[in-house]
Each structure stands twice: as structure tokens, then as C-alpha cells.
Amino acid sequence: MEGQPRGSRGPLEKPLPAATHPTLSSLGAVFILLKSALGAGLLNFPWAFYKAGGMLPTFLVALVSLVFLISGLVILGYAASVSGQTTYQGVVRELCGPAMGKLCEICFLTNLLMISVAFLRVIGDQLEKLCDSLLPDAPQPWYAAQNFTLPLISMLVIFPLSALREIALQKYTSILGTLAACYLALVITVQYYLWPQGLIRQPGPLLSPSPWTSVFSVFPTICFGFQCHEAAVSIYCSMWNQSLSHWTLVSVLSLLACCLVYTLTGVYGFLTFGPEVSADILMSYPGNDTAIIVARVLFAVSIVTVYPIVLFLGRSVMQDFWKKSYWATRGPPVLADPSGPWVRLPLTFLWVVVTLTMALFLPDLSEIISIIGGVSSFFIFIFPGLCLICAVDTEPMGPRVKCCLEAWGILSVLVGTFIFGQSTAVAMVELL
């Protein structure tokens, strides 16, 4: 199917989902997928190397996870083409039934809401630390407090970017955000070799043998870091070329590039600080280092560009709820279209206000990263596995191929269930 334009399909493919004027290029899809994955998890990756007991266990877990991460994206594209749906929750509802669709909507909305709050906290923390670096001996001015900077950025920058109707329009800001995340990885790599003044050299990161169960502690960070699967269906349905082989190539290129950025950050951050590495890698560096100050600014920019993608996905669930509401069925005509400005803009504003309020008044969210990573396993492993099991029943194929696909779907569900249970249990114990 390689090279087939949108609308042409192989003998085993169902009609492609009907998206409104899909114009997203392959390069644009790569950047949106890449930016969706290069989020706040980048700061935690060096710390994950330490928690897992060193580089070798982390590499092994990451390589195994990468196979499931790529297959999950491919499965979601295949499931979208089979079901004819254009949203993640729509695909699950169509293939797995209404009950599973409801569960997907609840998990989807909860997970994206938590991610949005975490992103806003990261933005606020980076801006606050930036002010401390620029004014080390002065009291914090009122305009540098998160209570002022976060609402200002949310209303002037985040809300306009999030109000866009289609996810394809995020490709421009995604390029900027991807470059900002790459700069962070580059700075951490270069700092290891240059050892600037003020950076204390730590002894080699040779750790004492850790229990084999410690390797599982890296799963939440991987799931939180590589979570671009929630956006996969929307991105796939926005592409002009929707052949499955082409989508596979886009998925592989995106995750390999993402893996490179995460690996450079994790390896060199861990080699630099060893067991003393901070959960926020930027906190381990001197606050007056110019390169680190620039990295803080650019990383905040990176998170600002990924927030609208998360909001777009959460808004799609709210728009599905709106379609079934009284106002959509019996209200004025302008309220019948959930993607129209009279519905889209208020829903966007509501999402920004709710997440902003939670970010300002809830305690530190760093401890619930494991919970977010655990819930993300639903969208990376469990739901794609269930969709594959259900989708093969609708396609004419040989018994051996069908058996292999069903076995892979079952394995994906089992792995996702284990990761969810393990990471959530550990997170709850740490919170208590």
C-alpha cells in the first residue's frame, strides 16, 4: 500500500474515515506526533535511569516498550480505517462496544485533564526558577509569581493556540516545540563534555545491584513520556495519505526520533550526576548558567506548544457529549455544530480555566506522574490491543494471520494491565 494516495485502498481495507478536508502532510504528522511525545517527561528521564538501577536495565525496558509503542500507533491507524471513526474514543466505541467506549471516554478525559494540569505546573515552575536565576539575591517581584504569570500566558498564548479547529494547524507550533525540546537534549549532552564552572563532577554512575523489580519503576516515565497515542487517530484522519504502510512509516520515524532525544537526555543527564540526579534534570545544574537559563525558557515554550494538542483531544470528548445534549438537538442552529465557534470557543475556554485553577491551587503534582503514566497504559497498550482483537473479526484474512494478530492483541492488553496495576499501586503507596 506504500505510496497510495488517500482514497485508494487494498483489498482488505475498509473505507477510510471521512475527515473534513484532510490536508496534513507526512512531515507535519511526524512533527505533531513527535511534539505530543516530547513533553514534561523529558525532565524525568535521567532520574528514571537512576530509579531503574542504571543504563542497561533502562535500555532493555525502553527497547521492549518501543516495540509496543510503535505497534500501538499502527494498530490505531488500522482500527480507524476499519471503523471509519475520526477520534480515539469513537474508534473504541465502534469496535469494542458502547460500554468500552464509555470507559475510554472517562479515562481519556481524566488522563488529558491531569496532563494539562501537569503541563501548566511545569510552565509555571520553569518561569519561577527562571526569575530566581535572573534575580538571585532579590525578593520575588509580584509579576514573577505563578499566580500572575500562568493566567497571563494561558489567556494570551495558550487559549488562542488551543482555539484552532483542526489538529493539522498545530504542525507549525509543533516544529518550534520540537526544536526547543531538542535544544534541551543538546545542552545536557554538551554540558557533560564541557563541565562548565559551577558544575560538580560526580563519581561514575556505577550503582550497587538493585532488585530486579526496580526496572518496573521506569514504565510510568516511559508511558508518560511517549504518550502520543491519544492523538494518533486524529492525526491519522487529518493526513492526506492514509495508507496503512505510510502511517507505519510515519509512526516509526516519529518514535525513533523521540527515542533519540529521550535517550540523549537520559544517558548524559545520568552520566553527569549519577545517583545525585534530580527528578527535574534542570534543577541539578547551576542556576546562573546561561545555557540552562535558555533551556528553561525554550522548554517552557515546548510545553506551551504541546498543551493545545492535549486540549484538542480532550475537547473532542466534550464535543461528543455536546452532540447528545439538549442544546445540540433542540437549541439554536448555531449550537448544533460542536466544532463551530459558538461551541468550540466556550469549551476551549472552560478547559483552560479548569486546568489553570487546578494548577494554581492543587499541591505539587510531581508525585502523581506515576498515576498519569499508569492511566496512559490504557491508551498505549490496552485499548489498541482490544481494538486489534475486535478489528480482525471484521476483516477477511487467513486463520494463521488472524491467530497471530489476536495473540499480539491479547499480549498488549496483558502488558498494559500489568503496567497500570504496578505503577498505580506504587504511586498510591508513595502518596500515602
UniProtKB/Swiss-Prot annotation:
Keywords: Amino-acid transport, Cell projection, Cytoplasm, Membrane, Transmembrane, Transmembrane helix, Transport. Signal peptide: none annotated. It is found in: Membrane; Cytoplasm, Cell cortex; Cell projection, Axon. GO terms for biological process: amino acid transport; aspartate metabolic process; neuron projection development; optic nerve development; response to virus; retina development in camera-type eye; retinal pigment epithelium development; viral genome replication. Expressed in neurons located in the gray matter. Highly expressed in thalamus, hypothalamus, amygdala and pons. Expressed in the CA3 area of hippocampus and in the Purkinje layer of the cerebellum (at protein level). Expressed in the eye. The chain crosses the membrane at residues 29-49, 59-79, 103-123, 144-164, 175-195, 215-237, 253-273, 292-312, 345-365, 368-388, 409-429. The keyword Transmembrane helix applies. It is a multi-pass membrane protein. InterPro entries: AA_transpt_TM (IPR013057). One of its GO terms (cellular component) is cell cortex. The keyword Transferase does not apply. Electrogenic sodium-dependent amino acid transporter with a preference for L-glutamine, L-alanine, L-histidine, L-aspartate and L-arginine. May facilitate glutamine uptake in both excitatory and inhibitory neurons. The transport mechanism and stoichiometry remain to be elucidated. Belongs to the amino acid/polyamine transporter 2 family. This is Solute carrier family 38 member 8.
